[in-house]
UniProtKB/Swiss-Prot annotation:
GO cellular component terms given for this protein: cytoplasm; Holliday junction resolvase complex
Protein name: Holliday junction branch migration complex subunit RuvB
Catalytic activity: ATP + H2O = ADP + phosphate + H(+)
Gene giving rise to this polypeptide: ruvB
Phylogenetic classification of the source organism: Bacteria, Pseudomonadati, Pseudomonadota, Alphaproteobacteria, Rickettsiales
Residues that coordinate or bind DNA: R308, R313
Organism: Anaplasma phagocytophilum (strain HZ)
Keywords: ATP-binding, Cytoplasm, DNA damage, DNA recombination, DNA repair, DNA-binding, Hydrolase, Nucleotide-binding
GO biological process: DNA recombination; DNA repair
Residues reported in the UniProt entry to bind Mg(2+): T66
Origin superkingdom: Bacteria
Length: 329
């Protein structure tokens, strides 16, 4: 049971890194339209002493879906229980979690698009009627046992919205699409992190890191921590644009935020001279197709470096110019 479900606790071995994650909705940077609406929904539910409608958070990885799930529970002043789609392989797994929820609790299911269909069907009645229908026995002796559940809020998170079945998708009253961050928003994320861990950084340094963070807070914080490591070792008093540029160069991150895997991806397509299928690319890079579609391609599409066609992936002129300017090809 503990492997399937855990209550949210700070990570004891690195509480400072955990503190980089905002815990209140007022501390959350970016996604302004979503946040303003979410404030209304949460306040309404809290004042009515009712459960918040089920929430579906979807968008590219690293934009704050898990953070928002924690914030929702904290703002509602209830407990958060979390698990993930791949862990729920049997009906009994989900039943054990649901029957252990307290009234008004928030259940967070990450990677909800990876739920088995039989698990989804159990969720339907739980989400709509707060009850659990379980088939007991087999064949002619089979019967349905109904178990009442406490009212709860399900928060689902996914990077693959299209893989969620329509019946499950329609049961979420609050679907929220998270989008890539602007450089200015990422600068605020980095400055907040610098303040939390007592690191001096000026606007130029924050901009240098933010502009290479692929529009993603998780990447911005990771790059900031690595630049901070160089700062500590090299006895630098402050992170400015020159120091950040040097550290990021050592990390293999170029001015557009591309890393070595991105360059391998783009170079392979360039050398093919024609459109290339995703399976061929995955085999050449020894990467999983899902990982390429979820972590590499969204940003390259956003900055206009690749196009998806019926025949496969092709590079844009902008991408080819970038590869040539940096002498990658």
């Amino acid at each position: 049971m503990n492997e399937l479900l855990h209550q949210h606790k700070a990570i004891p071995e690195d509480e400072r890194n955990f503190a980089l994650r905002p815990s209140l909705i007022e501390e959350f940077v970016g996604q302004s339209e979503i946040i303003e609406n979410l404030k209304v929904f949460i306040k309404s539910a809290y004042e009515r002493r009712a459960t918040l409608d089920h929430v579906l958070l979807y968008g590219p990885p690293g934009l704050g879906k898990t953070t928002l799930a924690h914030i929702i529970a904290k703002e509602l002043k209830v407990s958060l229980r979390s698990t993930s789609g791949p862990l729920l392989s049997k009906a009994g797994d989900l039943a054990a979690i649901l029957t252990n929820l307290q009234p008004m609790d928030v259940l967070f299911i990450d990677e909800i698009h990876r739920l088995h269909r039989n698990i989804e069907e159990i969720l339907y009645s739980a989400m709509e009627d707060c009850c659990l229908d379980i088939v007991v026995g087999e064949g002619c002796g089979a019967r349905t046992l109904r178990i009442d559940l406490p009212a709860f809020t399900l928060v689902g998170a996914t990077t693959r919205f299209g893989l969620i079945s329509n019946p499950l998708r329609d049961r979420f009253g609050i679907p929220l699409h998270l989008e890539f961050y602007s450089v200015e928003e990422l600068m605020l994320v980095i400055k907040r992190a610098a303040h939390v861990i007592c690191t001096d950084i000026d606007d130029s340094g924050a901009y240098e890191i933010a502009s290479r963070s692929r529009g993603t807070p998780r990447i911005a914080l990771r790059l900031f921590r690595r630049v901070r490591d160089f700062m500590v070792v090299e006895r630098q008093s402050i992170i400015d644009n020159h120091f950040a540029d040097s550290a990021l160069f050592n990390l293999g991150v170029d001015k557009s935020g591309l890393d070595k895997m991105d360059i391998k991806y783009l170079s392979f397509i360039y050398e093919a001279k024609n459109a290339v299928g995703i399976e061929t690319i995955a085999a050449a890079l020894s990467e999983d197709v899902g990982n390429i579609e979820e972590t590499i391609e969204p940003y390259l599409l956003k900055i206009g470096f690749i196009q998806r066609t019926p025949r496969g992936r092709i590079l844009t002129t902008k991408a080819i110019e970038h590869l040539m300017n940096y002498k990658y090809i």
